[in-house]
Amino acid sequence: MKPSTEWWRYLAPLAVIAIIALIPVPAGLESHTWLYFAVFTGVIVGLILEPVPGAVVAMVGISIIAILSPWLLFSPEQLAQPGFKFTAKSLSWAVSGFSNSVIWLIFAAFMFGTGYEKTGLGRRIALILVKKMGHRTLFLGYAVMFSELILAPVTPSNSARGAGIIYPIIRNLPPLYQSQPNDSSSRSIGSYIMWMGIVADCVTSAIFLTAMAPNLLLIGLMKSASHATLSWGDWFLGMLPLSILLVLLVPWLAYVLYPPVLKSGDQVPRWAETELQAMGPLCSREKRMLGLIVGALVLWIFGGDYIDAAMVGYSVVALMLLLRIISWDDIVSNKAAWNVFFWLASLITLATGLNNTGFISWFGKLLAGSLSGYSPTMVMVALIVVFYLLRYFFASATAYTSALAPMMIAAALAMPEIPLPVFCLMVGAAIGLGSILTPYATGPSPIYYGSGYLPTADYWRLGAIFGLIFLVLLVITGLLWMPVVLL
């Protein structure tokens, strides 16, 4: 798209800010809170339209608020306090997100992913599974799922995991059986494999806290609004029954609902064997990487009472550098990690300001009036369903989470009977699972959709079917299991 045709992307956020700012301040809100909300909404619009990278949008929003903090961030009472220096306070607020433990946890997880890539361990694991399970098409589907499952805990970019590691491997498989893209032969085996690729990415994105950046953004938003949080182990245990069910069910379900013509063959295992021979035996760097990953996972699951999850990640990254699994240049040159680091920290800062100015509490009280008379369970389920279905309107999981999660959290806070940890975990699971609904919902979606093996009608049909199944199972496990382990 030419720059001359993109002007509206730049003007739209500014127009939204101006329109909201000109609306009379609602009853119960102070003027600075309403103006803050106007800028916050403009940032969300900017994240959706992306006239510039999302991190830049968020940083610009923070800069505007910090510079104009006497009118946007602080109340007249705060400004009148003796010794109150808005310049120092606004700077402290602007950089507060970078001290959040969630930021450092996801940054460490990105470095784990770099270690997987640099050592070749991630590719080796996927090839081993394909070799062992690739004789039958159904088992090949499970191999794709298990590959995603193993990589997901330490690969917080589902795009890097799905599009960068898994897709380059499985795209080589269909041609081995003369299953070609954009051809009648695509249904032979290619369509099933590609659908398994994207659906496995969505499922595993919901299973682990560190499997997808928006999961950690949600926890940051939750913490800034309520001071409650979910640990890595909380998320894992809360999702455990649903995780087991989906990992075992989805490959078979795809096999039944989108059956491949070819049921078995030996070409895929032979190809995987050739690739593994070319890689050679497991090297010392891969062994060290494997040991560190296992250690990190054990501490994340069982060590929460002794060491913070972010500190585990930070320490393991230090060991990765010391053991020369990755280099310092790998860290400073990791654009994806630094990009997420800045936009996630900035969005958490903005969400903190939304709470500090009183908007979240005001919005919660507003919702409390409209939700009174309904049971907490009914309200919780209705909110999850609405949140899930609104996924159709967003082409970015980050924008989706940034725009809707604060409102969902405010709604839950409006009814003390709603267990916030359970509700937020259901929201978090919906972010990943709901990504299956459309061919534009998350980073890997367009990659698999554009492979030539998934026709448009098939993608939308399967997305709706699997999306509905995921939603039903999420609600059931959310109501029956999550309260047992989280409350």
UniProtKB/Swiss-Prot annotation:
Q: Which reaction does it catalyse?
A: (2R,3R)-tartrate(out) + succinate(in) = (2R,3R)-tartrate(in) + succinate(out)
What is the residue range of the signal peptide feature?
Answer: none
Entry keyword Ubl conjugation? no
Primary role? Catalyzes the uptake of tartrate in exchange for intracellular succinate. Essential for anaerobic L-tartrate fermentation.
This protein's UniProt keywords: Antiport, Cell inner membrane, Cell membrane, Membrane, Transmembrane, Transmembrane helix, Transport
TM stretches of this protein: 10-30, 33-53, 54-74, 93-113, 137-157, 189-209, 236-256, 292-312, 313-333, 340-360, 370-390, 393-413, 418-438, 465-485
InterPro entries in the record, alphabetically? Answer: CitT-rel (IPR030676), SLC13A/DASS (IPR001898)
Q: Name one Pfam family in it.
A: Na_sulph_symp
Q: Name one GO cellular component term.
A: plasma membrane
- Residue ranges annotated as coiled coil are none
Where's it found, cell-wise? Cell inner membrane
* Primary location recorded for the protein, binned into one broad class: membrane
Molecular function terms from GO: antiporter activity
The identity of this protein, by name, is L-tartrate/succinate antiporter
Primary gene name:
ttdT
Q: Which organism is this protein's natural source?
A: Shigella sonnei (strain Ss046)
Write out the similarity annotation.
Belongs to the SLC13A/DASS transporter (TC 2.A.47) family. DIT1 subfamily.
Transmembrane helix: is it a keyword of this entry? yes
Q: Tell me which NCBIfam families the record gives.
A: dass
Q: How does it sit in the membrane?
A: Multi-pass membrane protein
